[in-house]
């Protein structure tokens, strides 16, 4: 017999079909009108949130972040050059959008630490992620055996230690083809320059 979470997971495998698709259509209309970073009372994808460490207890909050898709936009230079050299639209960041969303959530709530995040929707212009944040100084977190380690860390997301950050840094790979990702890309670049 399947658990409730198995049914939720199955429904979210095709988020634009069936009843989840209908919900998504209404949700996206509402989310577009909201601010870029919004605290929400409970996770949209309960199965995913719980798998990533969410618990319905004091000291843990969920924030939905809207982020614009595509590469970074730069301010248009006002001095002369070839139009090819403007580089307004073709600035590809070395971070994935999920990592950027986590950083923005943490900037809004600086007293908290990013535990993890997951995708909840996208359209032609935006992507939405839900970020799980933990209050590192809350007594309920300090006394929780699974989450007490968070109270001993600071600025995980800015150091690329979340799952999305580790992925962008190439740390999902090991062995052949991943020689240059450890200890870090910067360390290997500096070593090469010596």
Curated annotation (Swiss-Prot):
Disordered, as annotated region: 164-194
Signal peptide: none
Domain of life: Archaea
SMART domains, alphabetized: Ribosomal_L15e
Molecular function terms, GO-annotated: RNA binding; structural constituent of ribosome
Chain intervals with Basic residues compositional bias: 166-175
Residues in coiled coil: none
Gene Ontology terms: biological process: cytoplasmic translation
GO CC terms: cytosolic large ribosomal subunit
A Pfam family the protein falls into: Ribosomal_L15e
Membership in a protein family: Belongs to the eukaryotic ribosomal protein eL15 family.
Protein name per its UniProtKB record: Large ribosomal subunit protein eL15
């Amino acid at each position: 017999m399947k658990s409730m979470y198995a049914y939720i997971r199955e429904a979210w495998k095709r988020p634009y079909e069936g009843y989840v698709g209908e919900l998504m259509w209404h949700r996206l209309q509402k989310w577009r009108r909201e601010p870029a970073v919004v605290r929400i009372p409970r996770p949209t994808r309960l199965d995913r949130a719980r798998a990533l460490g969410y618990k319905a207890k004091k000291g843990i909050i969920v924030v939905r972040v809207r982020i614009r898709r595509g590469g970074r936009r730069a301010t248009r230079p006002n001095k002369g050059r070839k139009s090819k050299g403007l580089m307004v639209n073709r600035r590809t960041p070395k971070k994935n959008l999920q990592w950027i969303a986590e950083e923005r959530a943490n900037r809004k709530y600086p007293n908290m630490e990013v535990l993890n995040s997951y995708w909840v929707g996208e359209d032609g212009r935006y992507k939405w992620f839900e970020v799980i944040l933990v209050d590192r100084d809350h007594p309920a977190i300090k006394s929780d055996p699974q989450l007490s380690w968070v109270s001993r860390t600071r600025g995980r997301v800015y150091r690329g230690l979340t799952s999305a950050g580790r992925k962008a840094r190439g740390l999902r790979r090991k062995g052949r083809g991943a020689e240059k990702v450890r200890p870090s890309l910067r360390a290997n670049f500096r070593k090469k320059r010596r």
